[in-house]
C-alpha cells in the first residue's frame, strides 16, 4: 500500500527544477522542497520556512506565532521535550527556531550523515507539536519572561515603539513577541487553531543546503511530512495589506530611569519587490550602515556626541522602514538631533557622492558574500528567496542588481523619501514633549 501511494503522489509531483546547483520540487498539496548542493562541506542545514509571522495575527492573539514556535518544541505525539533535546545533542547538532513579522523558521544544523534525523525532528516539531494544556501554561511563563527581558533592553523596546509609531494599528506595527496582556490571555484553543489554520502546505518551504542530494532529500521529505501535512489542512486566510493603515507616522515617548536618551526615527518605504530595492539599501548604507557613513562620521568621529549611531532598513512584502538610531547622554540629545537633521536634509537635497555610492555598493557586496560562509547561511538564503519570491534568486542576481545601482537613482530616492514626514520613538529619563529638541518636533510634524 505504501509503495502504491507513493507512486500516485509522484504523478502529481512537479518535476525538480535545477539551476546552478539549486533544485526545486513542489509536492502534492503545495509543499516546496529547495536544495543547494555544497560539496565542500560535511554539514547540512534543514529549515522549514512557514509564511506566517506576527503580521498575520489578530489583535486578540498578538504574539501567537512566536508563542506557538516555543510551544511546538515542548512535546509531540511521540517525543517529549527531553527526547527532542537528547536526539539533537547526541549528534552534536543544533535545533532551533525564530519568528519574524512575516515568517517563522524551524531549523536543524547537523553532519551530512545525520540528515535524516534532522528532517525527522524538524518535521515532527512543526507538524505534530501537541499544544498540550500543561505545556501552554509552562511556556506562557517563559514567553512572559522573554517579554520582560526585551522591555528591559532599550534598543529592543525602542524598536517596538518606533514601528508602532510608523505603522499605527496595523499588525506590522505590533511586537513580534506580543505583549504581557495578549500572551497572558491567550488560550490553548487559540494557539491550536492558529497552528491548524496557518501552517498549510502552500505556505511552507523545506530548504536544505550542504552536502546533500536533491532526490534523496525529496524522498525524506515525502516520508516524514507526507500525508500528515496534506490532510486536514484548510486554506490559509489572506494577509492584511499595509495599504490599510489608520493615521500617519506618529511620535511615541517612553520615560525610563537610564543614563542615556535613545531615539529612533524614520520613514515608510515601499516593499521588497520595489524596483529600487537595492538603491534603497545603498542609501541606507551610505547614511549609517558603516564606519565611513555620513551619520557615523559626523556624530561619533567628528563631534564625539554618541557612541552608538546607525541606520537600519526593515523590508516587508508591501512596505518597509528606513530608520536612524542614536543613543547619547540627555544633555547632548539636542546636539545629536541637530546633526541628524542636518545630515538627512543634506542627503535629501544634495544627495550622496559617487565615492559614497561606490563604497556603499562594495560594502553590500562584501557583506552578502561574507555572510554565506556556512550551510546554515545558504539554507536561510534559499528559504527566504523561495518564500518571498516563489523562486530562487541566486547570489549572482543580487550582486548584479547592486552593481547596476547608480548614484542618480540613490539621490532621486533620497529626495523622495527623506523629505517625508517622519515617525519617531524616544526613550529616556527626560522623554517628554516639552523636552523634545526643536529639530525632532519639526521632523515629526
From Swiss-Prot:
Any GO BP annotation: proteolysis
Source taxon at top rank: Bacteria
Top-level class of the enzyme under EC nomenclature: hydrolase
Residues noted as binding Zn(2+) in the record, renumbered to the chain: 66, 70, 146
Free-text remark on how the cofactor is bound: Binds 1 zinc ion per subunit.
Renumbered residue ranges of the record's region Disordered: 232-251
Cofactor dependency: Zn(2+)
Keyword entries, A-Z: Hydrolase, Metal-binding, Metalloprotease, Protease, Zinc
Active-site residue numbers: 69
Alphabetical list of InterPro entries matching this protein: Metalloenz_LuxS/M16, MPP/UQCRC_Complex, Pept_M16_N, Pept_M16_Zn_BS, Peptidase_M16_C
EC number(s) on file: 3.4.24.-
Family: Belongs to the peptidase M16 family.
Record-given protein name: Uncharacterized zinc protease ML0855
Amino acid at each position: 500500500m505504501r509503495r502504491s501511494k507513493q507512486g500516485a503522489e509522484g504523478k502529481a509531483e512537479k518535476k525538480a527544477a535545477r539551476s546552478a546547483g539549486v533544485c526545486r520540487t513542489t509536492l502534492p498539496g503545495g509543499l516546496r522542497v529547495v536544495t543547494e548542493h555544497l560539496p565542500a562541506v560535511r554539514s547540512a542545514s534543514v529549515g522549514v520556512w512557514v509564511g506566517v509571522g506576527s503580521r498575520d495575527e489578530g489583535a486578540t492573539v498578538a504574539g501567537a506565532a512566536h508563542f506557538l514556535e516555543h510551544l511546538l518544541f515542548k512535546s509531540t505525539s511521540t517525543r517529549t521535550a527531553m527526547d527532542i533535546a537528547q536526539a539533537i545533542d547526541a549528534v552534536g547538532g543544533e535545533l532551533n527556531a525564530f519568528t519574524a513579522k512575516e515568517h517563522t523558521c524551524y531549523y536543524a544544523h547537523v553532519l551530512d550523515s545525520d540528515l535524516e534525523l534532522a528532517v525527522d525532528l524538524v518535521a515532527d516539531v512543526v507538524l505534530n507539536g501537541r499544544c498540550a494544556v500543561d505545556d501552554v501554561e509552562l511556556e506562557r511563563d517563559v514567553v512572559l519572561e522573554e517579554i520582560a527581558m526585551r522591555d528591559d533592553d532599550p534598543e529592543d523596546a525602542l524598536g517596538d515603539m518606533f514601528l508602532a509609531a510608523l505603522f499605527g494599528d496595523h499588525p506590522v506595527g505590533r511586537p513580534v513577541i506580543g505583549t504581557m496582556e495578549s500572551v497572558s490571555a491567550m488560550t490553548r484553543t487559540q494557539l491550536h487553531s492558529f497552528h491548524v489554520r496557518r501552517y498549510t502546505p502552500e505556505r511552507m518551504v523545506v530548504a536544505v543546503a550542504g552536502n546533500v542530494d536533491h532526490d534523496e532529500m525529496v524522498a525524506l521529505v515525502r516520508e516524514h511530512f507526507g500525508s500528515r501535512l496534506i490532510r486536514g489542512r484548510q486554506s490559509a486566510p489572506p494577509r492584511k495589506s499595509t495599504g490599510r493603515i489608520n493615521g500617519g507616522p506618529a511620535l511615541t515617548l517612553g520615560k525610563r530611569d537610564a543614563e542615556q536618551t535613545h531615539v529612533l526615527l524614520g520613514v515608510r518605504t515601499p516593499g521588497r519587490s520595489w524596483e529600487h530595492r537595492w538603491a534603497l539599501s545603498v542609501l541606507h548604507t551610505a547614511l549609517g550602515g558603516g564606519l565611513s557613513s555620513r551619520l557615523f562620521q559626523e556624530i561619533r568621529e567628528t563631534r564625539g556626541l554618541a557612541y552608538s549611531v546607525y541606520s537600519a532598513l526593515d523590508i516587508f512584502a508591501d512596505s518597509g522602514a528606513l530608520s536612524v538610531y542614536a543613543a547619547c547622554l540627555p544633555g547632548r540629545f539636542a546636539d545629536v538631533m541637530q546633526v541628524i537633521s542636518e545630515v538627512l536634509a543634506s542627503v535629501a537635497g544634495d544627495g550622496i557622492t559617487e565615492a559614497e555610492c561606490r563604497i556603499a555598493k562594495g560594502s553590500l557586496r562584501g557583506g552578502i558574500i561574507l555572510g554565506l560562509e556556512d550551510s546554515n547561511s545558504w539554507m536561510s538564503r534559499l528559504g527566504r528567496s523561495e518564500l518571498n519570491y516563489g523562486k530562487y534568486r541566486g547570489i549572482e542576481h543580487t550582486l548584479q542588481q547592486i552593481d547596476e545601482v547608480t548614484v542618480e537613482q540613490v539621490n532621486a530616492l533620497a529626495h523622495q523619501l527623506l523629505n517625508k514626514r517622519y515617525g519617531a520613538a524616544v526613550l529616556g529619563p527626560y522623554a517628554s514633549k516639552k523636552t523634545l529638541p526643536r529639530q525632532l518636533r519639526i521632523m515629526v510634524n
